[in-house]
Amino acid sequence: MDTVLLLVSLCISAAFCNNEEERLLNDLMKNYNKNLRPVEKDGDIISVSIKLTLTNLISLNEKEEALTTNVWVEMQWKDYRLSWDPNDYHGISMMRIPSTSVWLPDVGLENNVDGTFDIALYTNTLVSSDGSMYWLPPAIYRSSCPVVVTYFPFDWQNCSIVFQSQTYSANEIELLLTVDEQTIEWIEIDPEAFTENGEWAIKHMPAKRIINHRLPRDDVNYQQIVFYLIIQRKPLFYIINIIVPCVLISFVSILVYFLPAKAGGQKCTVSINILLAQTVFLFLVAQKIPETSTSVPLIVKYLTFLMVVTITIVANAVIVLNISLRTPNTHSMSSTVRELCLRTVPRLLRMHLRPTDAAPPLAPLMRRSSSLGLMMKADEYMLRKPRSQLMFEKQKERDGLMKVVLDKIGRGMENNTSDDLVHSLNHAAPEIRTCVEACCHIASATREKNDFKSENEEWILMGRVIDRVCFLVMCFVFFLGTIGTFLAGHFNQAPAHPFPGDSKLYQPST
């Protein structure tokens, strides 16, 4: 029985309270016009306090220069028409009234990029008995954010979210930052709902009330509430997916210097393939950054630098190939160039080159060439010689003629000089004069061939020396440019204070 009485009393109380809220709402809305500014006199100014709570930094589209954020916009003001005495309404001190039924300050996002000035959801408005209004609607804003791409992808950006009244001037409403024990001059972050962005790290979140004194007070642009988001990019994605592969591919282009000097075609093929790969990386970066001519991104500078290095390597390969294929018939090497490129520079670079004037290594080649030539000339001599002479060669030996000839040749060989040998052969017998002339021709041709080949090898060695010098220069330039690029990006950090010259941190005091 007691339980039944308790339930009945609770139901009656709830019904009574609902009736009181309904009566209060009817009394408040009676003769209420939501289109009129809630002022008692024409000269009164309504103070509207604004606070921004960030729940998610969704993205920053560099191409469109648009910042997308998920926020809660808190607005507070007073409406004297919506005040009551709680004692008259069973102690009710707060009411929830649909925001579409009351006057709202027409404060919207000024720097939007999609034409949406309004909030996303019209939530209820909390109304206190003294007429204080509290409205906390959620919104997803796409605000304009001019992107500075000078140090991309090691950059930081200063984006702003600007609020101002669309129709009311400063003589009608006054925009202020919310005051709660102290003026909240920053963007609040809800620790329970906030989701960290994977690409951007928030460094500073200051807020300011901007007054443009160059405009009159009755201008709607006279006052603004600006919330700043100073964010630093996390460059790991671009380092792993663009910079590191590009550096490795470009380093391969330097390794073409280890190919032989005469392999110029293979050098050019490898370098041009690497150049095409670098062009693809440059195209990928161009799709990410805005189309601006005010500045060149750091990564574009670096990719252009690598392309210049690769093109230089291709040009060097063509020049070295031209030098390596030179012959004494078309070019002659001066003594100064020979001394510089084949002696001085290799000695400084500690290159182990065969001395150009070393005769012993050529001796086996000369002997092989001479033997081969003599055999060919001997075969030709046997074909041209009459058969009657071949039939009586043994008879000449019996007559002692061959013995005399061999003695004279032997005396020339004992002197161990080619001139004495030729002189002995000339006086040996008239029959072998033709053979002597053939031998002289073979020896002269062999010397010319060896000299030709030796000078041809000098051009090849010169190409090797140029390759080594260019390899060292390109390595130095490559590493210097790479280190300089990364250092420039490393030192481009967001400032310690949000505004230059202002030591205030614009954050909650701890």
Curated annotation (Swiss-Prot):
UniProt catalytic activity: K(+)(in) = K(+)(out); Na(+)(in) = Na(+)(out)
Compartments, as annotated in UniProt: Postsynaptic cell membrane; Cell membrane
Gene Ontology cellular component list: acetylcholine-gated channel complex; neuron projection; plasma membrane; postsynaptic membrane; synapse
Keyword annotations from UniProtKB, A to Z: Cell membrane, Disulfide bond, Glycoprotein, Ion channel, Ion transport, Ligand-gated ion channel, Membrane, Phosphoprotein, Postsynaptic cell membrane, Receptor, Signal, Synapse, Transmembrane, Transmembrane helix, Transport
Any one biological process term the GO annotation gives: monoatomic ion transmembrane transport
GO molecular function, one term: acetylcholine-gated monoatomic cation-selective channel activity
Main location: membrane
Residues bearing glycans: N158
Phosphotyrosine: modified positions: Y381
Membrane topology: Multi-pass membrane protein
InterPro entries xrefs: Neur_chan_lig-bd, Neur_chan_lig-bd_sf, Neur_channel, Neuro-gated_channel_TM_sf, Neuro_actylchol_rec, Neurotrans-gated_channel_TM, Neurotransmitter_ion_chnl_CS, Nicotinic_acetylcholine_rcpt
Cytoplasmic side: 324-468
Signal peptide extent: 1-17
Disulfide cysteine pairs (residue numbers): C145-C159
Extracellular side: 18-234
Spans traversing the lipid bilayer: 235-259, 268-286, 302-323, 469-488
Physiological role: After binding acetylcholine, the AChR responds by an extensive change in conformation that affects all subunits and leads to opening of an ion-conducting channel across the plasma membrane.
Family: Belongs to the ligand-gated ion channel (TC 1.A.9) family. Acetylcholine receptor (TC 1.A.9.1) subfamily. Gamma/CHRNG sub-subfamily.
Quaternary structure note: Pentamer of two alpha chains, and one each of the beta, delta, and gamma (in immature muscle) or epsilon (in mature muscle) chains.
Protein name: Acetylcholine receptor subunit gamma
Protein's gene: chrng
